[in-house]
From Swiss-Prot:
Name the record gives this protein: tRNA dimethylallyltransferase
Family: Belongs to the IPP transferase family.
HAMAP family xrefs: IPP_trans
Molecular-function annotations in GO: ATP binding; tRNA dimethylallyltransferase activity
EC number: 2.5.1.75
Organism: Streptococcus uberis (strain ATCC BAA-854 / 0140J)
Gene name in the database record: miaA
Region (Interaction with substrate tRNA) residue spans: 37-40
Length: 301
């Protein structure tokens, strides 16, 4: 039997320090970073997407950053294809792929083998998945019986995946993820995360977020990229509807809500091992745990 090669995945809500940790891990284990963020794919949108700085990108190779023009759409289907290609390339050069990001749908779609067909609207899949996850175990079993779906080993996650496959058919190709992965999450008390978010928004505004958002507003106000948090909150300010202070507060509030949704996703839908970032030694703990993971015998395919 062939052995599965290993990769590292770092997730968590916005503003917890995923980028910095990813660089530390890349430097410690001869790795390269694959961005798992739906907004960082866009050229010219650097501040509002919290993209790794030029200096940070020089300290560790980054993939899937600046690969789309702001006029182009990007989906979970695109990410899965691009990420698999990047992983294969990185491993072929004897390095460790490190996926770093907070877009739960993208990460889950990759790791759980959801290869979305081109005809499938990912919002339809997401809505159906949320509907299924609201059901009790008994209701899921009833639905499986109704659809004549059977599983050798029943878990909620496998049941939901099987029902989705039944619903969407060929547009949701179910393929096992071909690599063994360690899934690391960064988190802490909500108040601590929210404080970091507020500080980050202030820093972004000081770094030139207003000018970046104004460029997007003036040139491409209707594109997918303009709907991202960090930009849409400033559009009413440009239109004279609210003050800059109000826009700033809206941005902080929306970012906090987004972080809460991110955490809910990772906690409820993925098997993440979380590390509290308020502990000064957390990067050392993570690096030690990664070392153990990488040194263990690779899993049989």
């Amino acid at each position: 039997m062939t052995k599965k090669e290993k990769i590292i995945v770092i997730v968590g809500p916005t503003a917890v320090g995923k980028t910095a940790l990813g660089i530390q891990v890349a430097q410690a284990f001869n790795g390269e970073i694959i961005s798992g963020d739906s907004q960082q794919v866009y050229c010219h949108l650097d501040i509002g997407t919290a993209k790794a700085s030029q200096e940070e990108q020089e300290s560790a190779v980054h993939h899937l950053i600046d690969i789309r023009d702001v006029t182009q759409n990007y989906s979970a289907f695109d990410f899965v294809q691009d990420a698999l290609e990047a992983i294969k390339d990185i491993l072929s050069r004897g390095k460790i792929p490190i996926i770093v990001g907070g877009t739960g749908l993208y990460i889950q779609s990759l790791l759980e083998g959801y290869h979305l067909g081109g005809n499938l609207d990912q919002s339809a899949l997401l809505a159906y998945r949320q509907e299924l996850e609201s059901l009790s175990d008994e209701a899921l079993l009833d639905l499986m019986a109704e659809k004549n779906i059977s599983l050798k080993e029943w878990t909620r996650r496998r049941a939901i995946r099987a029902i989705e496959l039944d619903r969407f058919g060929k547009d949701l190709q179910n393929q096992e993820f071909p690599y063994e992965f360690m899934l690391i999450g960064l988190n802490d008390d909500r108040s601590y995360i929210y404080e970091r978010i507020n500080q980050r928004v202030d820093q972004m505004l000081e770094m030139g977020l207003i000018e970046e958002a104004k460029w997007l507003y003036e040139h491409y106000p209707q594109v997918q990229a303009s709907r991202g948090i960090g930009y849409k909150e400033l559009f009413p300010y440009f239109e004279g509807e609210i003050s800059l202070e109000e826009a700033s507060q809206n941005l902080k509030q929306n970012t906090r809500r987004f972080a809460k949704r991110q955490l809910t996703w990772f906690r409820n839908r993925m098997d993440v091992t979380f590390y509290p970032i308020s502990e000064e030694s957390y990067p050392i703990r993570i690096i030690n745990d990664i070392k153990i993971f990488l040194e263990n015998k690779a899993q049989d395919d």
